[in-house]
Amino acid sequence: SIFDNFLADNLNDLDEVAPKKLNYKDCITESYKENLEYKIGKNYNPLTNLIGNIDNIEWKSIYKGFREFNLPLKDNDTIKLIKMDPGTSVPLHSHNGKEYILVIDGSFSDEYGEYKKGDMQINDQNIKHHPTACNKNGCVCISITENDVIFFGKFASILNLFTFIKSFFK
């Protein structure tokens, strides 16, 4: 799994059940940044190199105000680019494993705080949250998850069934 090494130490440091909040700059050492800038230039954008111009993505509409773009990974790991319109929410859920969310543009908030451009939220299977896009422009983020989402609340059984069926078509 790609999660075995990806920021795993940060999850082990959690004393209470709450997401870990980092800024992407916290994850990169100064010497690494300088070396990277020397090799590829200051305007290097790994997201653009991975998927191209974000404005040209063919988003898949999941429900009103929520779109995603899936990038293929092996095993049960998923990486998605998610775009939420202002005020759009994701139902209360957790994950059957780890989840990393990096905000690329705009912001979202949940029970644990507000996450803005450059912030990273790190969750484990004990975290339940209900993210809502709260910026006037909505929110664009990268979500990397280890396993399927588990929904809670009024429509949980329907949403979980949909997730189960969808897992056969990955």
Residue map of PLM features:
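Positively biased amphipathic helices and basic secretion/translocation or surface-docking motifs
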Residues: S1-D55
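A short glycine-rich, His/Asp/Glu-containing loop-to-beta-strand
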Residues: N56-T88
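Conserved hydrophobic/aromatic beta-strand scaffold that supports enzyme active sites
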Residues: E68-N70, I79-K83, Y100, M120-I122, ...
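Short histidine-centered beta-strand/loop micro-motifs
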Residues: P72, L81-I82, P91-H95, Y112-G113, ...
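Glycine- and acidic-residue-biased ligand/ion/polar-headgroup-sensing regions
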Residues: D85-T88, H95-D110
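Short acidic-glycine-tyrosine-enriched beta hairpin
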Residues: D110-H130
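Ligand-binding loop in jelly-roll beta-barrel domains
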Residues: I127-F151
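Double-stranded beta-helix
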Residues: I142-K170
